[in-house]
Swiss-Prot record:
Catalytic activity: ATP + H2O = ADP + phosphate + H(+)
Protein name: ATP-dependent RNA helicase HAS1
Annotated organism of origin: Phaeosphaeria nodorum (strain SN15 / ATCC MYA-4574 / FGSC 10173)
Gene name tied to this protein: HAS1
Keyword Transmembrane applies: no
PROSITE patterns in alphabetical order: DEAD_ATP_HELICASE (PS00039), HELICASE_ATP_BIND_1 (PS51192), HELICASE_CTER (PS51194), Q_MOTIF (PS51195)
């Protein structure tokens, strides 16, 4: 029975009452829920508390009419109690709904989000063409993190990408390495998670796919700084890490997930507690590199598994046919294309001084040793073409008391992580590595990049030298070693808009240590074995080079090449140079991101100086 029915009965009782007897007026009830005064209107943010059941009964009893009929009064009180009980039930339902909305980000199920699209409260920049982060109308928590990180003005890719990403558009971005695109895609993703109030029970709302473990770790570090004040969760899954621990974290709920393709696909297929049906944003970073190392099939499978109702951001330093195919299947129709480099005169950054030196194979190591000796107080990265070459030269240089760090795909994941961050935090030192460190990694204040072995093509050259002179005002230098037979590579670099000058190094500045090197390799069993592995891998990598017209293995002087590994004569090795090498090289590259064979470090004798 409603309050209106109660009023009708009261009027009947008044009519039957004795003449001249006045009844107390009853307050009007307009909502048909309880006999209380209608509360004043409040703003959306102000919460209007529901009246307690005792208050409802008390207010109704005070406004009840006097009646001579006791049974009528008891009936009215019973009806009022029934109404109060309904009000209490409605209050509990409302409270439960509010609590569910708060915990589920407006969700109605255990881990389902009812909001399919970005909320209407998504940040909109306060100016038409923002140049500073404080003009983007970001949340206070994100802005506080950005200020703590020391950023005020945006780079070009950030200015062009963040506003449309905040509004929910799909973006295909092309930008040089070191352009600041990590913040360009993380800030909109974190703002989306915050505005939708994602909770761990909602599962994963954002996935960032990275080509290498080191780049994934770096993105994870940036995300950790940006999300320090946010309540959303974040995590990382990469090859070589503890899969069971990753699965447990995914089951607890990771709102922002950074991953390498192989491990991500593994969890999508096999981790039952991994909730990704609420995915709102997919970010593919360094897409060209992901495809180059052979993850095309994995990426296609990942895209098929993930929900289609999402925002997608795809960033690639170069636009290839495979990248276009990946964009076609992952992005919605009509994505926004952003290219911040098409008007630039050079393909590399302005603060980078680039040079090359022509030298024979038997001079290369002596030149490198002399250079590193002279620049021990600088921060230097040296690139090699194979894991075994890195292992040999790292063991050799450390043995002769020239400390270096090594980074390559055959290291266990924990060792890779430790050495990467050790070099990042160092003020000076030398890192020798394969191309596993060539893409996307933001290593602070690198002074020199040395390309001991030639890159696979001009694009790889650009990515290698991109480890130095990072940022809008970064400065750095690069030096590439070329054999006389490899000069044709300079023409390709010129066509790719790479400015290079020749560096001339006087012969008297190159230390003459060849005889000591050969004597050491002859006497030390472990170094001798490592040198053979490095020599064989160098020839295999050279034979599988994509630019065989320039890098022709048959033009190599094997005697001089052997001397660069400490042999007086070329060692007898089991090697096959053929068409299969290119395929083997790709398989080896894939293995860097998958399960690793057990590696043990060879025991060394005490250090010996030349």
């Amino acid at each position: 029975m409603t309050a209106a029915d109660i009023d009708s009965k009261k009027r009947k009782r008044k009519h039957k009452a004795k003449k001249g007897e006045e009844a107390e007026p009853v307050k009007a009830h307009t909502n048909g829920a309880a006999a209380v005064e209608k509360p004043r209107k409040k703003s959306k943010k102000e919460h209007t508390p529901e009246p307690e059941v005792e208050d409802v009964v008390a207010d109704a009893s005070e406004n009840d009419v006097e009646s001579g009929a006791e049974e009528d009064e008891e009936q009215v009180n019973a009806e009022l109690k029934e109404i109060a009980a309904k009000a209490k039930k409605a209050k509990k339902a409302k409270a439960a709904q509010d609590e569910d909305e708060d915990e589920d980000a407006a969700g109605s199920g255990a881990n389902a989000l009812a909001v399919a699209d970005l909320p209407s409260g998504t940040s909109i920049p306060t100016v038409d063409d923002p140049t500073r982060f404080d003009e983007l109308n970001l949340s206070e928590r994100t802005m506080e993190a950005i200020k703590t990180m020391g950023f005020e003005s945006m780079t070009e890719i950030q200015r062009k990408a963040i506003p449309p990403l905040l509004s929910g558009k799909d973006v295909l971005g092309a930008a040089k390495t070191g352009s600041g695109k990590t913040l360009a895609f993380l800030i909109p993703a974190i703002e989306m998670l915050s505005s939708m109030r994602f909770k761990p029970r909602n599962g994963t709302g954002v996935i960032v796919v990275s080509p290498t473990r080191e780049l994934a770790l770096q993105i994870f570090g940036v995300a950790r700084e940006l999300m320090e004040k946010h309540s959303q969760t974040f995590g990382i899954v990469i090859g070589g890490a503890n899969r069971r621990a990753e699965a447990e974290k995914l089951a607890k709920g990771v709102n922002l997930l950074i991953a390498t393709p192989g491990r991500l696909l593994d969890h999508l297929h096999n981790t039952q507690g991994f909730v990704f049906k609420n995915l709102k944003s997919l970010i593919i970073d360094e897409a060209d590199r992901i495809l180059e190392v052979g993850f095309e099939d994995e990426m296609r499978s990942i895209i098929k598994i993930l929900p289609t109702d999402r925002q997608t951001m795809l960033f690639s330093a170069t636009q290839t046919t495979k990248v276009e195919d990946l964009a076609r299947i992952s992005l919605k129709a009509g994505p926004l294309y952003i290219n911040v480099d098409y008007r630039k005169e050079h393909s590399t950054v302005e603060g980078l001084e680039q040079g090359y030196v022509i030298c024979d194979s038997d001079t290369r190591f002596r030149l490198l040793f002399s250079f590193l000796k002279k620049h021990q107080k600088k921060k230097v990265i040296v690139f090699f073409s194979s894991c075994n070459s890195v292992k040999f030269y790292a063991e050799l240089l450390n043995y002769i008391d020239l400390p270096v760090l090594e980074l390559h795909g055959k290291l266990k994941q924990q060792a890779r992580t430790n050495r990467f961050f050790e070099f990042c935090n160092a003020q000076s030192g030398t890192l020798i590595c394969t191309d596993v460190a060539a893409r996307g990694l933001d290593i602070p204040e690198v002074d020199w990049v040395i390309q001991f072995d030639p890159p696979d093509d001009p694009r790889d050259y650009i990515h290698r030298v991109g480890r130095t002179a990072r940022g809008s005002e970064g400065k750095g230098r690069s030096l590439m070693f070329l054999l006389p037979s490899e000069i044709g590579f300079l023409k390709l670099l010129k066509e790719a808009r790479v400015p290079l000058v020749e560096f001339e190094l006087p012969a008297n500045k190159i230390l003459n240590i060849q005889s000591q090197l050969e004597a050491l390799i002859t006497k030390n069993y472990y170094l001798n074995k490592s040198a053979k592995d490095g020599y064989r891998s160098y020839l295999q990598a050279y034979a599988s080079h994509s630019l065989r017209s320039v890098f022709d293995v048959h033009k190599l002087d094997l005697v001089k090449v052997a001397k660069s590994f400490g042999f007086s004569t070329p060692p007898r090795i089991d090697i096959s140079l053929g068409a299969s090498l290119s395929r083997d090289k790709k398989v080896e590259g894939r293995r860097e991101y998958g399960r690793q064979p057990q590696q043990g470090r060879r025991p060394m004798k005490p250090n010996k100086r030349f």
